[in-house]
């Protein structure tokens, strides 16, 4: 558990009346509220058992939350444990939390007993009375917490105002008689705005400030003044300082007022220093002679000086003189205290077993000389020259001028034009200022700057030729190894077309396959190209006029459109001619015929299967219409969801 506690997060503890109102209102809101005597008895029992169980569970959760959030004195740091004992009385605090735990156990027993009784309720009235008795006994049990809840709320309010003190951090602890300048020093070294008044016990509790030293944060704790009397006679204000002195591993700053304006003599202050001396065991102590602007250590008598120095030497403490009015010695006191505490903490770590275990594993490797040859550090000649000039008093050479220096020597920016060619290293220095044209004799000068440009060009051309040869070789591999004559190609095309026509004629002769318009069009195209006599007019039931009329159209006709055209053409014929044609016309193909492999015994079985498939597909077809074109309006307010106890705000339903 962390040593820094945040008591501000403890939830507010309600009073007894508020507690009961919270529990019962939650039970009313979260459980059903309507029951009728006509319901089955098991439903009525369940209704009231739910009420009792929910109330018992709610009280248990609330009381458990209180017990969990309040700290246990045995589990927290001893400093906070003793501080809470001083402020709130450990026994009273434990009794209050114990009462909360006892009432929680009592409520659980009441709920368990009445749930058992409700299982045997034989009517709505009896179940209701059992529920009423259960809630009443729970409320009566919670009434015993009236004083405990009030006390815990006061403790919570006071705990939320306690300072956040880390018992293990670097700490400077200020102590001494009242009105000796402790709070003034606190305000000087930290930003804590502690009240300072010219009377005693202005500071009535612990105040914490923070300061920085060597890039680390330090706690500075201002304690209330302590009077020189027995421990039993000290009040709560003084006991807070005693608790801090006893438990915090800090550097103790004991302030003394040699001018005795605090109302206590030097002897009394020395007596207090000796009486609380056992609390300084194992801690660095610094005695601060404050208010040096009024009285210094040299201004007091020799007897007082010897008395003070004897007490300091017995304790093994250090001493320093300061003045918070003139800031004399304030910074030195802060530095001395921090350095002393750091040294003390280092000594404690060195004496620990962990430090010894780590120290035994450390090894410091020191290089040894391999021969007698001296190998001094290398110093550049320029640096050695500067050292010699400095030793002899000669002026050191000036540094090399840069272009910026020349710029400011010649008028500043905009007036000086730097010469970028003066650092060029050419074969002939006279070539530096030569004017180089961009184009000469129709050639770009920069194309011939490279002396190897001709060789590079030849290499590039050779690479391009090799690449072209590779591409030609790949293309030659993709070409066919032989080529056909045009007449041979035409003969091959004629043979392929003839094979297609033969396949179409065979398909038309087969009665199981229907002849399509696309096949007839393909035959006509073949007749036009080859001069063959394969014509649709030879087909029974189709006249040459129909063929001619369809040939004039740009689009192919479907079977239905062909039938219409035949009807129109036949309307111009006489009745006898029509009868003659109809008597010799071909028979109509069956629309539903059983083909091999379909698995039907006859046409009737196939018709029955088609009808059943339509029936099965009907629900899916009904759902398929849902979309932008769907105009069906479903029931938007189903009665089973909107009947019952529904308030206007819409937050309650029938349950």
Curated annotation (Swiss-Prot):
Q: Which PROSITE patterns match?
A: G_OBG (PS51710)
* OBG-type G domain span: 170-342
Identify one Pfam family in the record.
Answer: NOG1_N
Query: Under what name is this protein listed?
Result: Nucleolar GTP-binding protein 1
Originating species: Trypanosoma brucei brucei
Q: Which GO terms describe its cellular component?
A: nucleolus; nucleus
Task: State its location(s).
Answer: Nucleus, Nucleolus
Under the heading CDD domains, the entry gives: NOG
Upper taxonomic lineage = Eukaryota, Discoba, Euglenozoa, Kinetoplastea, Metakinetoplastina
What biological processes does GO assign it? ribosome biogenesis
Biased composition annotated in UniProt, kind: Basic and acidic residues: 395-407
Q: How does it assemble?
A: Interacts with NOPP44/46.
Q: Which InterPro entries match?
A: G_OBG, GTP-bd, NOG1, NOG1_N, NOG1_Rossman_fold_dom, NOG_C, P-loop_NTPase
In which family does this protein belong, per the annotation?
Belongs to the TRAFAC class OBG-HflX-like GTPase superfamily. OBG GTPase family. NOG subfamily.
């Amino acid at each position: 558990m962390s040593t820094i506690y945040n008591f501000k997060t403890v939830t507010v503890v309600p009073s007894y009346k508020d507690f009961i109102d919270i529990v019962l209102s939650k039970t009313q809101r979260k459980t059903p509220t309507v029951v009728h005597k006509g319901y089955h008895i098991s439903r009525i029992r369940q209704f009231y058992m739910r009420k009792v169980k929910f109330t018992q569970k709610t009280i248990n959760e609330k009381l458990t939350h209180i017990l969990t959030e309040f700290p246990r004195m045995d589990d927290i740091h001893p400093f906070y444990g003793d501080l809470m004992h001083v402020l709130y009385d450990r026994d009273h605090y434990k009794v209050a939390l114990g009462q909360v735990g006892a009432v929680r156990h009592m409520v659980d027993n009441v709920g368990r007993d009445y749930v058992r009784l409700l299982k045997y309720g034989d009517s709505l009235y009896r179940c209701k009375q059992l529920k009423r008795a259960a809630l009443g006994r729970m409320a009566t049990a919670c009434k015993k917490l009236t004083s405990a809840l009030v006390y815990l709320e006061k403790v919570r309010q006071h705990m939320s105002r306690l300072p956040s003190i880390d018992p293990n951090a670097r700490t400077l602890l200020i102590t001494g008689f009242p009105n000796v300048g402790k709070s003034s020093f606190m305000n000087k070294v930290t930003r804590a705005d502690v009240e300072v008044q010219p009377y005693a016990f202005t500071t009535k509790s612990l105040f914490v400030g923070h300061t920085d030293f060597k890039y680390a944060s330090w706690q500075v704790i201002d304690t209330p003044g302590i009077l020189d009397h027995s421990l039993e006679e000290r009040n709560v204000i003084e006991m807070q300082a005693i608790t801090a002195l006893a438990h915090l591993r800090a550097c103790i700053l004991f302030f003394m007022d040699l001018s005795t304006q605090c109302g206590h003599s030097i002897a009394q202050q020395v007596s207090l220093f000796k009486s609380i001396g056992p609390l300084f065991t194992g801690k660095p102590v610094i005695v601060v002679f404050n208010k040096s602007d009024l009285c210094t250590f040299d201004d007091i008598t020799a007897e007082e000086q010897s008395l003070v120095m004897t007490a300091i030497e017995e304790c093994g403490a250090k001493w320093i003189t300061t003045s918070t009015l003139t800031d004399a010695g304030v910074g030195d006191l802060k530095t001395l205290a921090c350095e002393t505490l750091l040294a003390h903490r280092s000594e404690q770590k060195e004496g620990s077993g962990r430090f010894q275990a780590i120290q035994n594993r450390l090894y410091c490797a020191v290089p040894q000389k391999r021969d007698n040859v001296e190998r001094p550090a290398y110093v550049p000649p320029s640096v050695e020259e500067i050292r010699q000039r400095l030793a002899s008093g000669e002026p050191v050479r000036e540094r090399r001028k840069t272009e910026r220096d020349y710029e400011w020597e010649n008028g500043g920016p905009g007036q000086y034009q730097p010469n970028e060619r003066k650092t060029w290293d050419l074969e002939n220095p006279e070539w530096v200022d030569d004017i180089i044209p961009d184009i000469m004799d129709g050639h770009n000068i920069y194309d011939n700057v490279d002396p190897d440009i001709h060789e590079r060009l030849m290499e590039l051309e050779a690479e391009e030729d090799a690449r072209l040869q590779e591409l030609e070789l790949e293309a030659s591999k993709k070409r066919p190894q032989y080529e056909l004559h045009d007449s041979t190609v035409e003969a091959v095309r004629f043979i392929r077309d003839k094979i297609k026509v033969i396949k179409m004629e065979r398909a038309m002769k087969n009665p199981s396959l229907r002849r399509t318009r696309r096949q007839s069009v393909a035959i006509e195209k073949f007749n036009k190209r080859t001069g063959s006599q394969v014509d649709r007019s030879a087909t029974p039931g189709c006249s040459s006029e129909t063929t001619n009329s369809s040939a004039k159209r740009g689009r192919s006709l479907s079977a239905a459109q062909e039938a219409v055209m035949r009807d129109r053409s036949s309307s111009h014929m006489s009745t006898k001619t029509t009868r003659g044609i109809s008597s010799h016309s071909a028979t109509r193909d069956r629309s539903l015929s059983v083909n091999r492999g379909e698995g039907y015994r006859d046409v009737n079985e196939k018709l029955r299967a088609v009808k059943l498939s339509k029936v099965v597909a009907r629900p899916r077809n009904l759902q398929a219409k849902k979309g932008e074109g769907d105009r069906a309006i479903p029931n938007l307010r189903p009665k089973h969801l909107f009947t019952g106890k529904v308030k206007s705000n819409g937050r309650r339903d029938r349950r």
